[in-house]
From Swiss-Prot:
<feature type="repeat" description="LRR 6">
    <location>
        <begin position="220"/>
        <end position="244"/>
    </location>
</feature>
<dbReference type="Pfam" id="PF00560">
    <property type="entry name" value="LRR_1"/>
</dbReference>
<keyword id="KW-0433">Leucine-rich repeat</keyword>
<feature type="repeat" description="LRR 9">
    <location>
        <begin position="293"/>
        <end position="317"/>
    </location>
</feature>
<feature type="glycosylation site" description="N-linked (GlcNAc...) asparagine">
    <location>
        <position position="731"/>
    </location>
</feature>
<keyword id="KW-0472">Membrane</keyword>
<dbReference type="Pfam" id="PF23598">
    <property type="entry name" value="LRR_14"/>
</dbReference>
<feature type="repeat" description="LRR 3">
    <location>
        <begin position="146"/>
        <end position="169"/>
    </location>
</feature>
<keyword id="KW-1003">Cell membrane</keyword>
<feature type="glycosylation site" description="N-linked (GlcNAc...) asparagine">
    <location>
        <position position="402"/>
    </location>
</feature>
<protein>
    <recommendedName>
        <fullName>Receptor-like protein 41</fullName>
    </recommendedName>
</protein>
<feature type="glycosylation site" description="N-linked (GlcNAc...) asparagine">
    <location>
        <position position="266"/>
    </location>
</feature>
<feature type="repeat" description="LRR 27">
    <location>
        <begin position="774"/>
        <end position="797"/>
    </location>
</feature>
<feature type="glycosylation site" description="N-linked (GlcNAc...) asparagine">
    <location>
        <position position="109"/>
    </location>
</feature>
<keyword id="KW-0812">Transmembrane</keyword>
<feature type="repeat" description="LRR 10">
    <location>
        <begin position="319"/>
        <end position="340"/>
    </location>
</feature>
<dbReference type="GO" id="GO:0071215">
    <property type="term" value="P:cellular response to abscisic acid stimulus"/>
</dbReference>
Length: 881
């Protein structure tokens, strides 16, 4: 059972134990239940229900309803899961239920709602669950009035501030504030350490910090679960942790803890110990392998070294999951580990050992289900079919193991469900026997030297494979017919040619199809409207984009850029309400600008560059462009005309400096592949800079870019452009814009790349541009500008080519003097230009990331020219080992 399910069951059992005898009343009809609810309570409940959109409710669910006391008729419990949508206001009828003892409002949609101070009026509450419901801001201090609370769950919201609200909550047994934005230093005198009845405490995935984990945690000696994962704690774990003798689960991962592993030998009830992703050093105490109830141990990603000693008595160990990867152990570690015969999951990935791993040493693991040897040196002899590896094995990961032959060991594994041998040197053809493994569902063999398939084009059809990743090989010829069970298929960066087979239309379970960077020709099959993600970029496809998207089509991402497509943009895309990415750039599509797509509530990326779009870019109402979530707009190289209204940039997503901060670092969609692994979709961007085009992986969720260059736009640049504070790149070059450079550009505090060249702009360059500290590239050449060039560091560091073609400009870096200043020697500019060109040519090896100086600034400044989604098969442990 997963960690999440264990926790949920624990909380629900506690909740049920707090419910007093009462009558249940359905959501639809609060009058049933023998009239248990009083008339005033019925009226208040009806008012509360009407405050929200309840279309998502399962009205027959026993989890959604209200309970009333049999004797008084007062509402004592309200419970709604994944049901309510709207704003929970401070004048809500909810706060009329003064006899409430249990309130469960989880997985609802109270987006942009703060937690009202009125909750403090419900001072008889014993259980309060508000998790996963979109609450934001600080928890009001009035919570300290809820002195009867025994369980409080505020997890998975957008809450901030400190934990001062727990003062006076002395009866708390359960406190979960994980997955929020709580912060600050946990001081020894914090009210948290006065909650001596706590049995469950989760502070994970916040921003708490401390020079060391407070010793006072040792005072909470009734704790059964403690989670401080994914915070900013550092230093050594205090020895007082050994006082928590009731602990069954201890989570300290993804912090900056140092020193030796914490002393847990006294914690004899411990079943889960997660310490991964820290800086622990030294050796592993052998006593860890003899703890009587320990079943899960993750030490992955630390600085542990030395040998591993496992006592002979460990054969009776209950340890089932052991994660030791990414450490620096010495010697032959497999032999001692082989004594842990009850292991089901074993991670030895990226071990820095000087000895090859001999798979025959795994023969003692009779129940092994998952084995991860990614990044290890594997003995070639151990890959033969004579290996003694457990027949129970369900998942085997041998990525980046320098394997040159397809491992025949797989033949003898009838229960194998998931295999990863990607990023090796495997050559030749994929063996026919692979597709006969009866339970095989996920195959990752990308980034090898494979050239084809053994057998006929029908060889895959009857396979049980659901996920197949063949990326970055040398596969050629026609695409084989896919398995009938296929859900996810990626074969990007190969040499497949011919038509996309129509047999794909019979694969009703297919969600993801990624065939980009091949040599496919012919039309796009019209039957792909059921897909979630379709990527056909950089092939030789012809015809039009099929206009076959039905109502509520599930499409999230469509990329058909760099083909030979013609016709119009399909109007049926209006039916794709989940669409986030749309890229049709570099084709021959002839159409007007698709204003109609603004009804798509989730569209973030729109790439139409280098087509034949024509007509006005100004909206019909002469107002804002009106796309609610759009943040990357690339429409360069078309025939769009007209002027932009002053409100064109009003109400754009990029107006917020904190845009998408709650959505993680990268644009990503993940789904479970096998148990503890995920397959992730990551978006990518084509980076355009001075004629150079580079593909960059991992688009930041906080990136906002606009490229309107190479059209026929005219008139003034709207001052409303200054509202887009999250913008990092703006390209309006090669148009016919007139008037002054907007002063509001100085408000673009994140801007890194600004190109206004080849227009008809006049006046001076605003001094405010010189104060933009991230501005790494600016080009205003070939306009009608005059006056002195601002002398900020980011401006004077530009080459003179960025300002030439403006007869009235003067000052550095040009040679024209302003008010008697002397021009620097000519050879200085030559050196600057040579240096800049060298930087540009060296960009391809630069990773995405914010940095200092012109080189890194330029790299990040251009993280935007055109969106290009890419399917990547990422193996990420769900337990965040």
């Amino acid at each position: 059972m997963s960690e999440l399910l264990l926790r949920l069951n624990f909380l629900l059992l506690l909740l049920l134990s707090c419910v007093s005898p009462s009558s249940f009343v359905t959501f639809n009809n609060p009058v049933v239940g023998l009239g248990a609810c009083g008339p005033h309570q019925i009226q208040a409940f009806t008012q509360f229900k009407n405050e929200f959109n309840t279309r998502a409710c399962n009205h027959s669910s026993p989890w959604n309803g209200v309970w009333c006391d049999n004797s008084t008729g007062a509402v004592t419990k309200i419970q709604f899961m994944a049901c309510l949508s709207g704003t929970l206001k401070s004048n809500s009828s909810l706060f009329q239920f003064h006899e409430l003892r249990s309130l469960l409002l989880i997985h609802n949609n109270f987006t942009s709602s703060s937690i009202s101070s009125k909750f403090g009026m419900l001072n008889k509450l014993e259980v309060l669950f508000l998790s996963s419901s979109g609450f934001l801001g600080q928890v009001p201090f009035s919570f300290s009035n809820l002195s009867m609370l025994s369980a409080l769950d505020l997890s998975d919201n957008e809450l901030t501030g400190s934990l001062s609200f727990v003062r006076n909550l002395r009866k708390l047994r359960v406190l979960d504030v994980s997955y929020n934005h709580f912060s600050g230093i946990l001081n020894p005198n914090s009210s948290l350490f006065e909650l001596h009845h706590l049995t469950y405490l989760s502070l994970g995935s916040n921003s708490f910090t401390s020079s060391t984990l407070p010793y006072e945690f040792g005072n909470l000696n009734k704790l059964e679960l403690l989670d401080v994962s994914s915070n900013s704690f550092f230093g050594q774990v205090p020895p007082t942790i050994s006082n928590l003798t009731q602990l069954t689960e201890l989570y300290l991962p993804l912090n900056d803890f140092t020193g030796s592993l914490p002393l847990v030998q006294n914690l004899t009830k411990l079943s889960i110990l997660a310490l991964f992703g820290n800086h622990f050093s030294g050796t592993i105490p052998s006593s860890l392998f003899t703890m009587p109830f320990l079943s899960y141990l993750s030490l992955k990603g630390n600085n542990l070294n030395g040998s591993i000693e496992v006592p002979n008595s460990s054969s009776s160990s209950r340890l089932e999951s052991l994660y030791l990867g990414k450490n620096h152990f010495e010697g032959k570690i497999l032999k001692p580990i082989s004594k842990l015969i009850n292991l089901k999951e074993l991670d030895l990935s990226f071990l820095s050992t000087s000895y090859p791993i001999d798979l025959s040493l795994f023969s003692s693991f009779k129940s092994l289900l998952v084995l991860d040897l990614t990044g290890d040196w594997i003995s070639q002899a151990g890959l033969s079919s004579d290996s003694y590896i457990s027949l129970t094995l369900e998942a085997l990961y041998m990525k980046q193991c320098n394997i040159s032959d397809f491992p025949n060991i797989l033949k003898s594994l009838p229960n194998l469900e998931c295999i990863d041998v990607s990023n090796n040197r495997v050559s030749g053809k994929i063996p026919e026997w692979l597709w006969s493994l009866p339970r095989l569902s996920s195959v990752f063999i990308g980034d090898n030297l494979l050239t084809g398939f053994e057998g006929s084009s029908e060889i895959l059809v009857n396979s049980s494979v659901q996920i197949l990743v063949l990326d970055s090989n040398s596969l050629e010829g026609a695409l084989p017919h896919l398995p009938l069970s296929i859900i996810y298929f990626s074969a990007r960066y190969n040499r497949f040619k011919g038509d996309i087979p129509l047999s794909i239309c019979n694969r009703s379970s297919l969600d993801v199809l990624d065939l980009r960077y091949n040599n496919f020709t012919g039309p796009i099959p019209p039957c792909l409207s059921n897909l979630l993600f379709l990527n056909l970029r950089k092939n030789n496809l012809e015809g039009s984009i099929p206009d076959t998207y039905f109502a509520d089509a599930p499409l999230r991402s469509l990329d058909v850029g760099y083909n030979r497509l013609t016709g119009k943009l399909p109007r049926s895309l209006l039916n794709c309400s989940a669409l986030q990415f749309l890229s049709v750039d570099h084709n021959g599509i002839e159409d007007t600008f698709p204003f109609y797509l603004k009804v798509l509530p989730k569209l973030q990326v729109l790439l139409l560059s280098s087509n034949k779009f024509y007509g006005p870019l100004s909206p019909p109402n002469q107002g804002s462009l009106g796309f609610p979530e759009l943040r990357i707009l690339e429409i360069a190289g078309n025939k769009l005309t007209g002027s932009l209204p002053q409100d064109f940039f009003v109400n754009w997503k990029a107006s917020s400096l904190t845009m998408n901060e709650d959505q993680g670092l990268y644009m990503v969609y993940s789904k479970v592949v096998y148990g503890i692994y995920y397959l992730s979709y990551l978006a990518t961007i084509d980076l355009q800079y001075k004629g150079l085009s580079m593909e960059q992986k991992w688009v930041l969720t906080s990136s906002a870019t606009i490229d309107l260059s190479g059209n026929r736009l005219e008139g003034e640049i709207p001052e409303s452009i200054g509202l887009l504070k999250a913008l990092i790149a703006l390209n309006l070059s090669n148009n016919a814009f007139t008037g002054h450079i907007p002063l509001s550009l100085a408000n673009l505090v994140k801007i890194e790349s600004l190109d206004l060249s080849s227009n008809q702009l006049s006046g001076t360059i605003p001094n405010g541009l010189g104060t933009l500290s991230f501005l790494a590239y600016v080009n205003v050449s070939h306009n009608q500008l005059n006056g002195e060039i601002p002398q900020g560091t980011q401006i004077t560091g530009q080459p003179k080519s960025s300002f030439e073609g403006n007869a009235g400009l003067c000052g550095l870096p040009l040679q024209q003097r302003c008010f008697g200043t002397n021009a620097p020697p000519a050879h200085q500019f030559k050196e600057e230009e040579d240096e800049e060109q060298e930087q540009v040519l060296n960009w391809e090896g630069v990773a995405i990331g914010y940095g200092v100086g012109v080189l890194l600034g330029l790299a990040i400044a251009q993280l935007i020219a055109s969106y290009k989604p890419e399917w990547l098969a990422c193996l990420i442990k769900s337990r965040n080992r």
